[in-house]
Swiss-Prot record:
Keywords: ANK repeat, Late protein, Repeat. It comes from Vaccinia virus (strain Copenhagen). The keyword Repeat applies. SMART domains: ANK (SM00248). Transmembrane segments: none annotated. PANTHER family: ANK_REP_REGION DOMAIN-CONTAINING PROTEIN, ANKYRIN REPEAT, PH AND SEC7 DOMAIN CONTAINING PROTEIN SECG-RELATED. This is Ankyrin repeat protein OPG189.
Amino acid sequence: MDFFKKEILDWSVYLSLHYIARVCSNSSTSHIIQDYNLIRTYEKVDKTIVDFLSRLPNLFHILEYGENILHIYSMDDANTNIIIFFLDRVLNINKNGSFIHNLRLSSSINIKEYVYQLVNNDHPDNRIRLMLENGRRTRHFLSYISDTVNIYICILINHGFYIDAEDSYGCTLLHRCIYHYKKSESESYNELIKILLNNGSDVDKKDTYGNTPFILLCKHDINNVELFEICLENANIDSVDFNRYTPLHYVSCRNKYDFVKLLISKGANVNARNKFGTTPFYCGIIHGISLIKLYLESDTELEIDNEHIVRHLIIFDAVESLDYLLSRGVIDINYRTIYNETSIYDAVSYNAYNTLVYLLNRNGDFETITTSGCTCISEAVANNNKIIMEVLLSKRPSLKIMIQSMIAITKNKQHNADLLKMCIKYTACMTDYDTLIDVQSLQQYKWYILKCFDEIDIMKRCYIKNKTVFQLVFCIKDINTLMRYGKHPSFVKCTSLDVYGSRVRNIIASIRYRQRLISLLSKKLDAGDKWSCFPNEIKYKILENFNDNELSTYLKIL
């Protein structure tokens, strides 16, 4: 069979281990017996051997042992030969005999003796023996046995196994040890990692994601200074992964002060930028003053992108760091983007409450209007943040900002009704409100009536002839049409939908009064030769430019 051909012996271990690992990762141990078919039984297998196999739980949990009989299960008949080859030819388990013919099975046998005999066994089908005699290297074997005992690794390394063998993801055993590092078992992991490092495992070898073992050591929650220093001796301190993060980026993100200090002292690039434009300094500033001081005291001048760094601090609500950098003159919070966004607007956008309070207390200007028409008030409503809304209103925003805010709010159909009511309640009490109402633009002030969605539904259910009251108030652009229905009982009833309903009635009354003035003045002017030649639309456009007092004055004169 193909699996027994000499030219593919070098791949056999990889195939078998890869298959078993894949099957194990997709199945739970509680369903092994139900999901797998019994494919081979081995008799007279000593429990010591089973204990040894159990040291590879990711590979050998598809086995059952009882009464000196080892039962092997598989659910994929097409790959059965791979498992059989691994057990029969690699581990030399004989189907009807003992585990290894020259291995004395006794209660005193230990794993070390077993491994030595496994490596040095003269059996003609000994997979490891054949590989060593032919000077071959298995490219994938070590990468799948990270859960085995360290003595096994040492023996294999001493017999010429390739220490940086890669799996299908480009990971070496050193990669996998760091990937699966557990604090609860840190002592055994530390020992194995040291063995690999001291035997020359490549700390700069990249997997398919661009991670080197050294980058992983910096990225993961491993704080062993001894391991870090061993890696640092042979590592490229400015290596990058696929996102162009360097080791210094990761130790700064993890707030590993000692590691940051070591890397900077070794000349790591403090201005290296990842693909998002972030430097290691940006990653470290959110953790407090000690790391900031370390960077500022370095010999290399830091590249500071003011807008980027302030926004980074705002996103993480790092007030302490923000205050310290301001006191050192490193940053400036008084910036405006091309969209007219400020640091206070960013604090509202990112829900950074503590930073917002800090910036407002420094007399920051929060009455900004972005190029898209948004304000800090409208942004707080969009984020559904009542606490920030209360803080902003406590700073007494102007009427201009409140009107612009509510226009922006009503453009967003998902706005929070309660927060909109807060805006209306604040705005309606301002004494100069009437002076800003443009009676020609009732449509622009629909937010004034949109205080309660339940009452809006009532408007949609009330009909005047073939139109709903909602259509008349918000959809009809012809003022004359609106005036025709102004006295209808259903329309008048809806003016009570707002606690300030009198204002709605006053607006409608003002529209009627103004139209009457324009109509009267136009008739008076028609007596003149030239005025009568103008179309009515032009006449109205001209007269619309006068306020009510001017219209009344001209009427009296004429």
